[in-house]
Swiss-Prot record:
Protein name: Probable ubiquitin-conjugating enzyme E2 33
Organism listed in the record: Arabidopsis thaliana
Domain UBC core: 5-162
Record keyword Membrane present: yes
Gene that this polypeptide is encoded by: UBC33
Pathway: Protein modification; protein ubiquitination
SUPFAM superfamilies: UBC-like
């Protein structure tokens, strides 16, 4: 059972977060347990975590703020082991260094900063930049599978829906562009085919024209034919004139 001072402190911190949100950090208490908070860290630009949304939990002790909370991360991220407590100076791994003045916002800001670092610690893992980027890209889809996440962070669910629509539109546009690029190739092939047929027709016509011209050249002119007919007629008429 949470102590009265603990409840009062956490309620105050939640109001402060709602009034003055912290950059790249969203945190909300569970509707059924004020000691259990759920958070989302947004990956910073210029890092392998850019574009990622990292969901996790903070479990406060009833003695908070005089004792530190436990912190875990649910989203696969390439920096911390999921569902395992993370060792931080602000977590229950180091109660001796805990400062009661630290708040939810300072805890999560510190976690985000430590996430960008590569220093090994209990609960950390070592992965490549490419792996972190891959996990960042798939983080929102992973988170939206959680019923609790969808209930506590509807704005991220809406963001994921918008991403899906945008990806579908981009895929459709890419398909249309690819098809449009194929059409000119088909049209060009058709034009080339028509040109080839046209050239064949022209070639046939030219051959026919040349043949007719050659035949005309080989045929005797009309006046020569007429002269020959006249001569033949005279020759045939000579015997008759002698009678």
């Amino acid at each position: 059972m949470a102590e009265k001072a603990c409840i009062k402190r956490l309620q105050k911190e939640y109001r402060a977060l709602c009034k003055e949100p912290v950059s790249h950090v969203v945190a909300r208490p569970s509707p059924n347990d004020i000691l259990e908070w759920h958070y989302v860290l947004e990956g910073s630009e210029g890092t392998p975590f850019a574009g990622g949304f990292y969901y996790g939990k903070i479990k406060f002790p009833p003695e908070y703020p005089y004792k530190p909370p436990g912190i875990t991360m649910t989203t696969p991220n390439g920096r911390f082991v999921t569902q395992k407590k993370i060792c931080l100076s602000m977590s229950d791994f180091h109660p001796e260094s805990w400062n009661p003045m630290w708040s939810v916002s300072s805890i999560l800001t510190g976690l985000l900063s430590f996430m960008m670092d590569n220093s090994p610690t209990t609960g950390s893992v070592n992965t490549s930049v490419a792996e972190k980027q891959r996990l960042a890209k798939s983080s929102l889809a992973f988170n939206c599978k959680s019923v609790t996440f969808r209930k506590l962070f509807p704005e991220y669910v809406e963001k994921y829906s918008q991403q899906q629509v945008a990806e579908e539109e981009a895929a459709t546009q890419q398909t249309t562009t690819s098809e449009n690029q194929d059409f000119p190739q088909k049209d060009n092939a058709k034009v080339e085919s028509e040109k080839s047929v046209g050239l064949k027709k022209e070639s046939i016509q030219e051959v026919g024209l040349k043949e007719r011209r050659r035949n005309k050249k080989e045929a005797l002119p009309g006046w020569i034919v007429l002269l020959l007919v006249s001569i033949v007629g005279v020759v045939m008429a000579l015997p008759l004139l002698q009678l």
